[in-house]
Amino acid sequence: MPRMPTFAVIGDMHGNLPAFDAVLDDLAVVKPDAIYLAGDYVNRGPQSGAVVERALALGLPAISGNHDTWLASMAHGRHIPTNWDDSWWTPQRLAVGELTPSRLAWLDGLPATLHIELSGAAPALLVHGSPRGSREGMGRMFSDEQAAEALVGVAERTVIGAHIHYPWERRVNGAHIIVIGAVGCPFNGDINAQYGLFAWDGETHDWRFEQRSVPYDHERIYAAWRESGYLDDGSLAAELMLLEHRTARTHYVPFWDWCLARDLPLTRESHARFVAERG
């Protein structure tokens, strides 16, 4: 019986080089037929430049994520917050500073989607968020109706995404949506580096999904947080991002959204109210 094709999708590295390297080491053992990069190489971690450099050197098929386009736009002088010098933006300021011309050019050149085609298997579509854009996540809060709307015009039966930082699957109107976990900053309570491995099933004519969880030396990324300058000016945003690394739970965006809904500043005083209200 012929060997069925396999491929891996890795995404949401988010400035965490030790996690990225651990996944690459695991892939060297697993040896899939192809490897694809699903975006969000930068931000949320202290090694954005190093992660982009590693990805660039690999030369693998890759797409962009919402954090990549966001930081690249700021590197080009666009979408700069009015309070850019505030410590809340320290992580982004430092990450943008790591985007050398070659790194920025690589990010600028990334497509939003990729068509995965391996001999002997049905094609799949790789996106970062959803087929409609990198900021729209397909996950637990995504209804069947929303999923069906997001898939309008998509020819592939299998759509693979990232962005939400936890693995998730759904079948809608004959389509198979698969979302991989995050390499650098998971939000499913598992602090290991995570990625997706796919194998074609010749009997069901579908892609089988395996979520891989790879241990790595977390002290290396914690040391990078301490040595990078991200925490030097008391940035609350940096502290929340570090907490996400330590807990594998989301903290930054819920606080951001809570403040926006109440027209409150992103300050420690607001965060104290946020924590008290959430319990």
Identify what each model region corresponds to.
Residues 51, 57-116, 122-123, 141-155:
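Active-site neighborhood of divalent metal-dependent phosphoester bond hydrolases
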Residues 128-172:
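Ligand/cofactor pocket segment of small-molecule handling proteins
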Residues 27-31, 118-120, 153-155, 197-199:
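Glycine-rich phosphate-binding loop signature in dinucleotide/nucleotide-binding domains
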Residues 2-8, 116-125, 172-176, 204-208:
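Beta-strand-turn-beta hairpins that frame and shape the catalytic cleft
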Residues 1-58:
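N-terminal active-site segment of His-dependent metallophosphoesterases
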Residues 10-11, 35-39, 44, 61-66, ...:
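Active-site neighborhood of phospho(di)ester-bond hydrolases with catalytic His/Asp-centered motifs
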Residues 171-180, 184-279:
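Acidic, His/Gly-rich catalytic cores of divalent-metal-dependent hydrolytic chemistry
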